[in-house]
Amino acid sequence: MSEKTFLVEIGTEELPPKALRSLAESFAANFTVELDNAGLAHGTVQWFAAPRRLTLKVANLAEAQPDREIEKRGPAIAQAFDAEGKPSKAAEGWARGCGITVDQAERLTTDKGEWLLYRAHVKGESTEALLPNMVATSLAKLPIPKLMRWGASDVHFVRPVHTVTLLLGDKVIPATILGIQSDRVIRGHRFMGEPEFTIDNADQYPEILRERGKVIADYEERKAKIKADAEEAARKIGGNADLSESLLEEVASLVEWPVVLTAKFEEKFLAVPAEALVYTMKGDQKYFPVYANDGKLLPNFIFVANIESKDPQQIISGNEKVVRPRLADAEFFFNTDRKKRLEDNLPRLQTVLFQQQLGTLRDKTDRIQALAGWIAEQIGADVNHATRAGLLSKCDLMTNMVFEFTDTQGVMGMHYARHDGEAEDVAVALNEQYQPRFAGDDLPSNPVACALAIADKMDTLAGIFGIGQHPKGDKDPFALRRAALGVLRIIVEKNLNLDLQTLTEEAVRLYGDKLTNANVVDDVIDFMLGRFRAWYQDEGYTVDTIQAVLARRPTRPADFDARMKAVSHFRTLDAAAALAAANKRVSNILAKSDEVLSDRVNASTLKEPEEIKLAMQVVVLRDKLEPYFAEGRYQDALVELAELREPVDAFFDKVMVMVDDKELRLNRLTMLEKLRELFLRVADISLLQ
């Protein structure tokens, strides 16, 4: 069977840049599924994406499905015919479904009986006939949160569609996709190359688009070119470009023919905190800032034009004129804000609502101030500095700079605090209170900052759970999942001596009578333990290891982490599987018994050598391991407990627990309970698979 290259290009108006990659990848994934479901042999499915097009190119696509033999078994003969030999309704219905009459059916005989059988040779459909529906289905399944409708048609897509190119080899596949009749026409760059041209063969793509249309269709190629050219441009002016992955992706999604240029701004603007300038350049203008080797911002920026100009200086000057007013605004706001102290913004916090039932930002500030001081006392941080940081924590939200450039919250608080002469760890805490902002983000760097960051997040968790507005499904408007994971990361990775129970209780207490959820403390802790589950799964821990630790509900995050590492190590020991099974057996035996057990094992009642040996080792280990448990040395404790494998195995091989002698039975049950309690001091290893 011959093979050909298939090309589908959907020509659109400008697609959302932040969604371009996901749209293209999903298109390719969806179409691959369609090909496989149809049984069409194919080679690589390659995707291309540019601002005004989504394209797939499929190599070595079979021209038709393979022929196949099908068999459909019908009713058993006993049910297929009545006593007179006439076909039953079941047999007739089955035959209609197969497109035959009952008398045309074959018979299938096995050692289990005889059935009606339909056999047929099905000729594979041509690829040409299948492709239109496969393309339409793949497009319909794209992850588009908001569809558009254009013109008078009822067609919906992410953006209006102007061209649809469907080529199998050199042949146009006739179809109407998204309201457009397929053709071999492709549109080029808006301002360079040929605005529109025809493509003779699918194999010509994407080279023909580059040569005639001045469009680089390959997304990764454009991105790599921007990165390489920007690095070279920065090197020429003695700096390093800030090429963040997210901005690189966005810029690559905005241009069809990237041309990297370098521009500058007045050095006087460098007196403004670099973060504000960078926010303007990256967030508003999609420029790449440039830093000197010492990390200081240079008065230059790199940008990407979407056209090759005969006079690039004109484009450079235009971009410099665009950014200058924004930088001047930042300079004005910075100078204006510094005319008063950061603390002077406190009264204005009373005018901004945090949440209707939970009060204003000033109310939140007062709670954070108190909670940060309490946390500082627990972890050995400077209490005065922590409470001061709490008091100032939201003041920068009332400044002109943060009002205009919202992403500078925190960092501007730090700069204004330094200007006011606040302690350095207080100033740093104002900047780091929102960390970690995302997975893998840096944690607060000093104890005061840790106290403030935890206080801010715990206040939000306690308040929102306290009024019953916990996250539901994918909806998490107050970012509580991120807040909970942030608290856990800070406590675990900084090894802070904090207990979620007392921490949550203190956060709840500071709300007074504002909260309506009587179970708020337990709800917050359960939610945070659930975040632990997600965190450790992402770290590669098995679900049963996590369950074993969660069963003990440890509320000290650092302690939880130590238990996780201990159980994970325990699983590598030779004795682990046997002891996990033994614990499960012990758990089941104890669960089935409703008898009241003694506080201690009566050694004089023991009879069998195996139970005597096990009882002695349990007593010895109980005393030996007490310091281990007190110090959180759970891994060492489980290594010691692994030595119980042989006596435990011997006990269950030789000793009957549920004997008729009540005293003996209760004594043996008590011994098993004491054995299980030793393991439960770390985790419920009976849950290990």
Swiss-Prot record:
Enzyme Commission no: 6.1.1.14
Source taxon at top rank: Bacteria
Catalyzed reaction equations: tRNA(Gly) + glycine + ATP = glycyl-tRNA(Gly) + AMP + diphosphate
Alphabetically ordered keywords of this record: Aminoacyl-tRNA synthetase, ATP-binding, Cytoplasm, Ligase, Nucleotide-binding, Protein biosynthesis
Disulfide feature: none
Record text on subunit structure and interactions: Tetramer of two alpha and two beta subunits.
PANTHER family the record matches: GLYCINE--TRNA LIGASE, CHLOROPLASTIC_MITOCHONDRIAL 2, GLYCYL-TRNA SYNTHETASE
NCBIfam families named in the record: glyS
Family as reported in the entry's similarity comment: Belongs to the class-II aminoacyl-tRNA synthetase family.
UniProt-recorded name of the protein: Glycine--tRNA ligase beta subunit
